[in-house]
Amino acid sequence: QGRIPSKANGMSRHIQLEANLSLTGANADERIALTPDQVKKALAYCFQYLKGFEENEQFHFPTSIIEKEENKVTIEDKIKKIASELKKAGRKALVVTGIDSAEAQLIAFAINEHLQSEAFSPQTPVLTRKGNVKALQQLLTDMNEGKVGALFINNLNPLYSLPNAEAFAAGLKKVPFSVSFAMRADETAQQTTLWAPQPHYLESWGDVEFKYGHYGLMQPCIRPLFNTRQWQDCFLQWVGHKESYYYFIKAHWEAHILKGFSWEQALHDGTFVKEDIKSFELPKEEKIPSLRKPPMTLTREESLRLISTVLPRELVETPFELSLYTSTALGDGQQANNPWLQELPDPIHRTTWDNFLTMHPTDAQTLGIENWHTVDGALDGHQAKISANDKSIIAPVLITPAQAEGSVGPRRESWLCRHAGDLRSSPGGPRRESWLCSHTGYLRSSPGSATYLWCTIGQVVLPL
């Protein structure tokens, strides 16, 4: 309230397009509720306006109407306005997308290149994710065909996190020797040949490369509290290296990164940036493969081809779209066995523990889904069943006015909380099992406190 972005006060104007109401969206200057597919189309539509294509070359957006006072404003009109604002901001503008779609990321890339955004530097991409889905699928195939002789797993729990965990479990049984480097005896560690307990990252040495040419050093806050050893030290000892991982890092940095700069100073600062970072070249395997030229040099035909991958001329509407999001408290679910995090209320919905589906009131009314408060302040309501391939999940439905129509939003990490029930009330005490994937029991709350979900009546199948 009272926020007026302008050049004078140095505030940036923020526009959010999303399906689920996020903290960022709730604080945006303008928020438009769209399904994930509509967000991709909005990006493409915005790009074609920035490129200045003729009217007869445009791909049209769905004619959904947004009611605003007495005026009817189409989503198409709103996207045109966004494109105009981006064009006016020029180099000071930035477009980012969190959609898990290569096409959407490419169009966002192209928009930023077209605007010559100062905040966008493709030569120094962030390296926070280095996963390779194709390589993982090949590993699963090789494991199940008996082609893997030894498997080392570091700080990962595939039997918990993979969507096709059954295939990994079957393949793991065919691997003669396997080791899991993990802090806990999780699902994967319990199935491998050996479990090598790891120290906490605050007890460990390490180094990182945030983006190309930008490095950081990780220093332990305390000595390991338990009888654990870093996986790097394990491998160094196995290959006959007598020095610890600390000296290995130091030698590597002095030879390949610092090149004359003081190790003690780098350790003191915690970070180090190469002086020749502006001329740093991307490795060939890291270059974006889908665009042979930088987007600024794309011809009209190439731009239209890129847009058409997301915004076809014939639009096919689906009944519902699944819009997964990450829990603020649990993140990717690695700490799902922490009851304090399970008890932390969601900052938007005020819910704790159980997972749920967010749904727009109009969709809920169409399906006959309702929520109601009981006399003790708890929230009750209907459940919905979501099926994909041969799997299905059942979850309570939380009716959310800010949800985009035609979409439902479950948290992505909470369907697989198998080890989250490993909570002990006292040292050596009995294990308390909790069914976090569907129900946690009738949890009551006093009026005005966090809302606990417990849905017992009815079931609706959503056609995704």
Residue ranges and their predicted role:
Residues 1-27, 124-129, 137-225, 253-426, ...:
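A cross-kingdom feature strongest in bacterial/archaeal respiratory oxidoreductases
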Residues 2-92, 98-99, 110, 235, ...:
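Long, well-ordered, tryptophan-enriched scaffold segments
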Residues 106-138:
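Anionic-ligand anchoring segments at beta-strand to alpha-helix junctions in alpha/beta enzyme folds, i.e.
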Residues 229-254:
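Non-catalytic, well-ordered alpha-helical segments in soluble enzyme domains
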